[in-house]
Amino acid sequence: MENLSILEQAAKSTSKPSPDAVVAALLEAEKNARKNKIRYSFEQLIGNWQLCFITGTKKTRQKAGIVLGAGRYIPQWIAKIQITYAAEPVAEGEENSETGRVENSVQVGAIVLTLSGPTKFLVNKNILAFDFTRITVKLLGKTVYQGFIRGGEAREAEF
């Protein structure tokens, strides 16, 4: 349970644990979830999440060399990165379908870039699948561009 307190401190405290301690806590939490076959639901993910720490895969870290290291905090004065999961509206009397929408927003100064698209929680695999199909660019709070990306309209219909 110490790993959970390290992760909570990394997310909420001004005195942050070392990046190595956070990576070790993340790996331990992941190992524990697999060992205990912890199952999640889409409902547990719904809401706004702020990204405050990043890691790469071992392969990515090897490619990046010492520049990336094992993990890094994202300074809030550089960028604010937020991801939002929302459930699709369900008609009265219908069962929740484990589908919804995702929005990933990156704010740097007065510019906000948002990628969004459909999500589907694959219960048997305990995985959230998603596809970014739309982009919105805002400058000083005003939308300057909004549209589908990479054949997004067709991909969204197929999802």
Go through each PLM region and give its residues.
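Soluble ligand-binding/transfer domains with enclosed cavities or grooves
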Residues: E2-F159
